[in-house]
Amino acid sequence: MPTSTETIELSIVMPCLNEAETLAVCIDKAQDYLERSGVVGEVIIADNGSTDGSQDIARAHGARVIDVPARGYGSALMGGIDAARGQYVVMGDADDSYDFSKLDPFVERLRAGDELVMGNRFKGGIAEGAMPPLHKYLGNPVLSWIGRVLFRSPIGDFHCGLRGFNRQSIINLHLQTTGMEFASEVVVKSTLGGLRVSEVPTTLDKDGRSRPPHLRSWRDGWRHLRFLLIFSPRWLFLIPGAVAFFLGLIGTLFISFGPIILGDIGFDVSSQVYLAALTVVGYQSVLFAILTKIYAQHEGFRIPRSRNFDRLERRISLESGALVGLALFLVGLAIGIWQFFAWAGEGFGSLDPSGTVRTAVLAALLMMLGAQTIMAGMFLGVLNVGLKRDR
């Protein structure tokens, strides 16, 4: 235990919910590391409401217990991190699947200036039976690959439970998630925030519990995937939306001049209606991606930028949105008025329904796109007012 005059360098934080079977050995390994290495540190057990006496076991083995009433993996860890007194924090599960006596690689990288040091179980070795095949061959590799692609992260194992970080750097990220997706949030926000990130090989042993783990494969896997997608508007909204918008718009315009025949397949009014709907959905998705990215960048998240987007952001405003939207709306309205006078010229009699509907769909589409653009410009104006006030 550090004396009252010693500055604590390392806090080893373990989330805990009924870990009486394995908690003692985890704490002993952590204490052994601190004693052997000479690192001035502490062991913190962030207890999430254990009813099996885990708190008493932790105190008996020299750990500091922090009661965290808010349930969840992320909640427990943030409670422990907030209470930590060390410059650095190493966090890991209290189920004896990670070896807390071998933390030298993490501490070395942290002392070298890295702000997040991730363990990589696939490089260090996974003991037989330590990880379900679904997680080993599908869940972890696929989700980690998605994370690397979406956020250009160098991390190969997004969900390793053993990781170290500079405490203040992580607190500055303002982490929010309370469940298992906390593991992904740390990596994603560290990457977007420009933190110095690295990884070291680590091992994963079969945990020592006789009960099932807290992890729920499909539920928690979905939470990880959902978080990754929400923080990547480019892949979730922009690219799919742009594809839908251009396909729908081109199809709508072509059919407005007459049916399209491809072999034995004909595309006419009914196809045009669906293509117009696809255009509207795609356009809304693109607008949402742009607004989301602008908001995220104003909030300090370092989402990868591009020159084209920077130029677009400078040109987008309430006024420009209103002008472009009004122009689209008026063009659509003009087509509708022209169609009305054409009908009047026929004495308000019967018209070719196919040709009439094709023109009406195009006019309605332009009016809807115009209205959406005006509303997006107004929302951006409100957003900018709110951001300026926050500053």
Positions of predicted regions on the chain:
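Conserved donor nucleotide-binding strand/loop of the catalytic core
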Residues: S37-I44, Q55-A83
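Short beta-strand/loop segment that forms part of the nucleotide-sugar
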Residues: I27, Q31, G38-G49, I66, ...
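A conserved acidic beta->alpha catalytic loop
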Residues: D47-Q55, D96
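N-proximal low-complexity "stem/linker" segments adjacent to membrane-targeting elements
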Residues: M1-D32, V39
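Donor nucleotide-sugar binding loop of glycosyltransferases
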Residues: E19-T22, S50, Y73, D99
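Hydrophobic helical membrane-anchoring modules
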Residues: M1-E6, R152, L175-R391
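Acceptor/aglycone-binding surface of glycosyltransferases and processive sugar-polymer synthases
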Residues: V68-A83, Y88, F100-M180, K206-F227
